[in-house]
């Protein structure tokens, strides 16, 4: 089994009835319908669980559905603990991470619902749970409808033939990181930026302005279902101005294929880490934020950054489809495998070199 095969992740359909009563559910009181998806499923099926960490976003946004979340949560969980995540200052969440670890001591499984989480919060939270000596389920529900619809995009494009419209978010506030997700490795070396393009070209533009990257790799999402294929061309058109900063190299992958994303990011890292500082930004889908966490733990020298927007558009997503689940029998053990990946990979390379040397000697004789 290769080093990559030992850290493969499996995404399967999630059954709420399969969860024991003694879980700690971690979710966000966001503005999307899918922020309430798990709670709705639990209520529909009459399920009760032990405890919940409910995360409220700052700065305050009236579109976030805290009251709805709280009302449903009180009918599902025996204990609810509220915590605050400041999108503009993710470092402030450190104390909450310690408290979440303390709360986990009284349960048999932790369930992290990334469906409506900020992508930076996904990385910050999973990284903060690295020492969790328990089973962990990462659950994710796609939205039923993703904005903008094609007609809205075409209308905006026609009005702004020279400028790029942006959807879903307003302008970028600043680029953030945290102490544990940053890296001082390769100081002074040229920088490679890896990001996932979306409908707001200002996000990656802000990354390039902030970091002065010499190389830009864009991981584009291949649309599923096929009727959404127009979105890739739209995102390319919206982000076309990035070439005024640096000409990007583009790759395509299925955003929901965790292992394909890990393998692609690993390939880019291997090609450039000896000569460049590697920065990675989780600007893509929620599951790609999970793979960003994996890469950071495979290679601690990777520098994680994220462009925080001021606010989100009224129309972002609609509806909530069925949950899928990444189930890990022991999260700390899995993180250890990620950490040991570098050693296993070096061992594989050494064996390849030794076999090549033996073949060369054989040919000489």
Label for each model-derived stretch:
Residues 1-109, 120-365:
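Long, low-complexity, Lys/Arg-enriched
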Residues 115:
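Interfaces and regulatory segments of ATP-dependent nucleotide/adenylate/phosphodiester-chemistry enzymes
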């Amino acid at each position: 089994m290769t080093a990559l095969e030992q850290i493969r992740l499996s995404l399967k359909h999630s059954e709420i009835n399969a969860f024991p009563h003694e879980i700690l559910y971690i979710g966000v009181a966001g503005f999307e319908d899918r922020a309430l998806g798990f709670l709705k499923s639990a209520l529909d099926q009459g399920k009760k669980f032990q405890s919940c960490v409910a995360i409220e976003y700052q700065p305050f946004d009236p579109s976030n559905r805290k009251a709805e979340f709280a009302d449903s949560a009180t009918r599902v969980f025996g204990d609810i603990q509220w915590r605050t995540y400041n999108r503009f200052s993710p470092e402030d969440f450190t104390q909450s991470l310690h408290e979440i670890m303390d709360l986990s001591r009284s349960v048999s499984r932790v369930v992290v619902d990334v469906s409506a989480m900020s992508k930076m919060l996904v990385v910050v939270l999973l990284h903060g749970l690295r020492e969790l000596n328990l089973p962990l389920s990462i659950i994710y529900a796609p939205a039923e409808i993703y904005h903008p619809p094609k007609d809205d995009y075409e209308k905006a494009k026609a009005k702004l033939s020279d400028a790029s419209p942006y959807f879903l978010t307003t302008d970028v506030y600043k680029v953030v990181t945290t102490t544990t997700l940053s890296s001082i490795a390769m100081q002074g070396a040229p920088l490679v930026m890896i990001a996932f393009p979306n409908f707001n070209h200002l996000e990656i533009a802000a990354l390039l302005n902030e970091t002065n990257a010499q190389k830009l790799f864009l991981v584009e999402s291949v649309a599923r279902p096929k009727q959404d294929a127009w979105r890739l061309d739209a995102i390319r058109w919206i982000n076309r101005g990035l070439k005024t900063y640096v000409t990007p190299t583009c790759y395509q992958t299925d955003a929901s294929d965790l292992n394909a994303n890990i393998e692609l990011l690993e390939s880019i890292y291997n090609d450039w880490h000896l000569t460049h500082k590697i920065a990675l930004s989780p600007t893509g889908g929620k599951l790609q934020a999970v793979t960003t966490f994996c890469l950071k733990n495979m290679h601690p020298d990777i520098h994680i950054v994220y462009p925080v927007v001021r606010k989100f558009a009224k129309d972002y997503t609609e509806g909530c489809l069925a949950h899928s689940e990444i189930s890990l029998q022991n999260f700390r053990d899995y993180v250890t495998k990620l950490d040991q990946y570098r050693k296993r990979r070096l061992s594989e390379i050494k064996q390849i070199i030794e076999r090549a040397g033996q073949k060369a000697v054989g040919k000489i004789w």
